[in-house]
Amino acid sequence: RTLHGLVLSQWRVTDVADYLQRVARWVPSIHSWSVCDIFSFSGGKRWVAAHEVEVWSFLLPYFSAQRTYEIRFAVVMGLQYFAKQSHLAPFLAQLAAITHEDYYVRMAVAWAVAECFTHCPEDTQAWLAQNLLPAWTHNKAIQKIRESYRIDAETKRELLLLKRPVEKSK
């Protein structure tokens, strides 16, 4: 699985549709966060930028998948390639729509929000203030942002005000 993902990450792409089909056949075999997170699209950010519409369309169904690592795949690919101003609103909307309760999905969403914050702090902070995420994921995103060395002390203090109470499980 890992090797397959690594091979796909280095694949010489001559046909976008064929390549995305190969990736789609691999995605169901993802069984851990490490296999998921090691993958990147062949050609990296430059390739994705050249095929942004196709790649975004390819990822969209995975955001609403039922399987943990299919959702995590969409979120991790999103944070790698779409956590930027030009795609911020649709990416954050996809993150807010995720209702899957698995730890690895929730952590990926928190990580993605933190990554969005580093690239677009004002817009992401305003989005966080809308409380669109479940409380645990919302607070974990704030924690991850505050742990970053790229965020100044004043912003870290402001973010504390956005934390929400989380119900303890019985």
What label would you give each PLM region?
Residues 1-170:
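Alpha-helical scaffold domains
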